């Protein structure tokens, strides 16, 4: 019995707002069933004796140090704005009332 049916693929497509043809539904059902079969094989691997680990590779942090540097003052940030009101940027309204 397949792990995922054509109807389940159609349901997922509707939830994702994807318009799929009948041929695509059949194709994706087969592909997803194959993927789920491979995942099932992985879940059957005996791993009870394997200790949990965060990362199998010894990776060190390669980011730069977090150093505080001076930023813009509110006045400097607002100085290039086309419109300012009460110390804030004024932008065009994009939502209607109550949204």
Curated annotation (Swiss-Prot):
Q: Name one GO molecular function term.
A: ATP binding
Alphabetized, the UniProt keywords read: ATP-binding, Ligase, Nucleotide-binding, Protein biosynthesis
Which InterPro entries does the UniProt record give? Asp/Glu-ADT_sf_sub_c (IPR036113), GatC (IPR003837)
Q: Which reaction does it catalyse?
A: L-glutamyl-tRNA(Gln) + L-glutamine + ATP + H2O = L-glutaminyl-tRNA(Gln) + L-glutamate + ADP + phosphate + H(+); L-aspartyl-tRNA(Asn) + L-glutamine + ATP + H2O = L-asparaginyl-tRNA(Asn) + L-glutamate + ADP + phosphate + 2 H(+)
The highest taxon in the source lineage is Bacteria
A Pfam family this chain is assigned to: GatC
What HAMAP family does the record tag this protein with?
GatC
Q: Which PANTHER family match?
A: GLUTAMYL-TRNA(GLN) AMIDOTRANSFERASE SUBUNIT C, MITOCHONDRIAL (PTHR15004:SF0)
| NCBIfam families noted in UniProt | gatC
Q: What is this protein called?
A: Aspartyl/glutamyl-tRNA(Asn/Gln) amidotransferase subunit C
Q: Which organism is it from?
A: Rhodococcus jostii (strain RHA1)
Q: Which gene encodes it?
A: gatC
């Amino acid at each position: 019995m397949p792990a995922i049916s054509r109807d389940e693929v159609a349901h997922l497509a509707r939830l994702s707002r994807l318009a799929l043809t009948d041929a695509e539904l059949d194709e994706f059902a087969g592909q997803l069933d194959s993927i789920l079969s491979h995942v099932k094989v992985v879940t059957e691997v005996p791993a009870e004796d394997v200790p949990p680990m965060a990362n199998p590779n010894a990776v060190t942090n390669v980011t730069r140090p977090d150093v505080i540097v001076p930023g813009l003052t509110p006045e400097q940030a607002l100085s290039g704005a086309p419109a300012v009101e009460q110390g804030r940027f004024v932008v065009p309204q994009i939502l209607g009332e109550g949204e």
